Design a protein with these regions (language model features):
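Amide-donor transfer/coupling interface in amidating biosynthetic enzymes
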Residues: 1-49
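Core nucleic-acid recognition elements
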Residues: 34-190
């Protein structure tokens, strides 16, 4: 049982543990039921930015520990891959997008120029890039609110954020390995 704050450190937590003890001592019969679940088939579509939107791809200057962790996990599962991660911003403006983009860039709100820089997607043949977006992105909404309210950037209409996973697979059947990687759900939470 994992709870925060730790119940064993408070008097109120005693009730939880005494209840657990009582449950264990009464030997309640466990009614096992089989669970059958078949996840829905994943559909991947080619990304098309919205009309009048600009795309920023942000790379880290330093090593991305999350990408290294994902790469190590995939390699432990037997996949010979290299993994990198980038942040994807889709910025929709009402007019004069170059001036609006300059304001957004100057704000430092979407990326920290001391640690990150604007980049491009990799273009190697063995690399595939996958854009993953959250269904409800609170972080992106906070950035949008900050840009429109705090920095008074009125021409910003919409902001979308995602993570781009770049997976390089060398010397193998790319499609079958890629589908096996997707089946691990390590890149996203379905």
């Amino acid at each position: 049982l994992a709870m925060m704050p730790h119940p064993e450190r408070t008097e109120l937590g005693d009730k939880l543990f005494s209840s657990m003890k009582e449950y264990i001592e009464t030997s309640v019969a466990i009614n096992e039921k089989k669970i059958s679940y078949k996840p829905t088939e994943k559909t991947i579509t080619d990304y098309e930015p919205h009309e009048n939107s600009n795309v920023w791809i942000v790379d880290l200057i330093i090593t991305d520990n999350e990408a290294v962790t994902v790469e190590n996990a995939l390699q432990q599962k037997g996949f010979e891959v290299e993994v990198s991660k980038q942040t994807h911003w889709e910025i929709s403006c009402s007019k004069n997008s170059s001036a609006t983009l300059k304001q957004i860039d100057d704000s430092g709100e979407l990326y920290n120029s001391n640690k990150e820089y604007l980049s491009d997607l990799p273009e190697e043949k063995e690399t595939i890039s996958i854009l993953i977006r959250q269904k409800e992105d609170v972080h992106c909404q906070k950035k949008f609110d900050s840009l429109t309210q705090r920095f008074k950037i009125r021409d910003l209409l919409q902001l979308k954020r995602g993570v781009v996973w770049n997976i390089t697979i060398k010397n193998a059947n790319f499609n079958s390995i890629f589908n096996d990687i997707l089946d691990t759900n390590i890149l996203h939470n379905p």
